């Protein structure tokens, strides 16, 4: 019934298996990928008819993580996989980027690739398996897929490169890098790094590139046995058509490209296609040429003009040389109500960035196959249509916005303080207000400025730069700080972010058949020089974090309590913690390890909440004086609430220095009286006295004294505490960063 074909290779100590012919047999290409306990189904479907006139490859990649793959039921009301998560979007883009450039340039058939995780093993990198499976499925399909791609993940642990590190290993790694390519060249790089040098990054890419070559071999073997006939492709346009357009319109195109302003240049270039189509109207009517062929030939001429100017004259369309950076302007604190803000402008690209602090309750909860976890740092990239003067409605975040936001997140995350050093959650919103190339790197620069102005103690300022490439044969030019047109007509988009000491993020996308390591080395060094120049301009405005947080930022403190006191703060059904939050206006977050974080809009509210918590968790010392409230009067005495939610008993003999007939003749419910703690009974209940308490010189407080040895009312040896854990919950000897206020200088204003 099944004609299954399987190929396998031992890769990094695990067996990687690719098979076809058993599942999803009606798809044009279907491959099951297995490694460890991970199983993915990758399919490729190609439409029979071309979608002419669209000017781009209609390729859609969908990566899906099925909940059952990890033995889970989806959350939410419907208990069903819904819209793609950010993780699924990011992996979909990761698959798309190395694959898209490898189709025949004239191929415009609708193509859909789906990669579904059917079984999940945290010891294997499913995103890497998805890239491999998608490439294999396309190689089996009729799509004119010209090269075979594979990928690998690289970590750096204890100075050694690690192939396909597990999630546990990645937590200790200085590098998280994905590299994809063909047998000859690198096609895509995506990474987050902890201040690594250009040399280390290049060596990591080489390591990953060499590591996936055995995988390419088994994909080729599978394709040789199971592939379907490829679609026959024609040239995009006749060569004679291009020559005719050049002869008639090249001068006008060159004049338009000579305009330095993007908007004016675009306006003039947009007028040319209509003129060209009008000239060839009879040929279109006679079906000698199609609109799509004419427009494609015109785009090729525009590309030739831009590329020749760069390669032959070292001159770009805005007049810069290949290494020049556009003019930079930085401004901070322009949004008075934001916790931090900055405006970063580089040429005609501009990003308005704001920073907001929140509590641990505001952290992003992420539900993934690995399990549920929280993200303390959030970065949202917004690309509104007005930034490129387009009249379009605002929509939900696109895949591009999610991807650009994650790249900027990767660039900033390595230089952020940890939660002990800075207890807030952080949200950065970067709105691209103008765009002419490299808006994601403008986001990185603006985010660094806004964070420093907000007072976040980042390790160092971060800047980003986008590099381009124009390559013809062996001749090539690497471009610093590319424009939108240079990105569109160029061969590479290579984004590098980092500090003056090293790289924090790197992303490379190639539009040709690949680049070699010589080009990458030149691009990395040129990017380093450009990054240093940008940092120099940024440092003129702000070079280190402000010492004070914004007056609008919330106040916070973190204390450490005994774990057995957690339930006392929470109370039955959360009654106590709710009451504290409602009366103080603060927010409280309690961790399982006994860390209590308190947040409030101002210091007064913070103090109220903190005092209430202290009153609950402290262990009062014998001999302390308190202002107590009478809660119940009995014939034998009275119950007094003397601190927090703690009640003690005053025997009738301890109510007054004089003999009294009844307790009710002296005390009434609700009375405020001074009481002194004189000991505990055999059940651990507090014993109090009112006699002479108001004459004691000790003042009322809710913080216990240190090492106070008091005697009981009989002047005998000091009573033992109720149990061996009666040491104070409020431990003054705790580490300064985790006990009281974490650096009061910064977090209180």
Curated annotation (Swiss-Prot):
Keywords of this entry: Cytoplasm, Magnesium, Metal-binding, Nucleotidyltransferase, RNA-binding, Transferase
Domain KH per the UniProt entry, residue ranges: 554-613
Biased segments, Basic and acidic residues type: 714-723
Gene3D superfamilies, alphabetized: GHMP Kinase, N-terminal domain, K Homology domain, type 1, Nucleic acid-binding proteins
Catalytic activity: RNA(n+1) + phosphate = RNA(n) + a ribonucleoside 5'-diphosphate
Residues annotated to bind Mg(2+): 487, 493
The name this protein goes by in its record: Polyribonucleotide nucleotidyltransferase
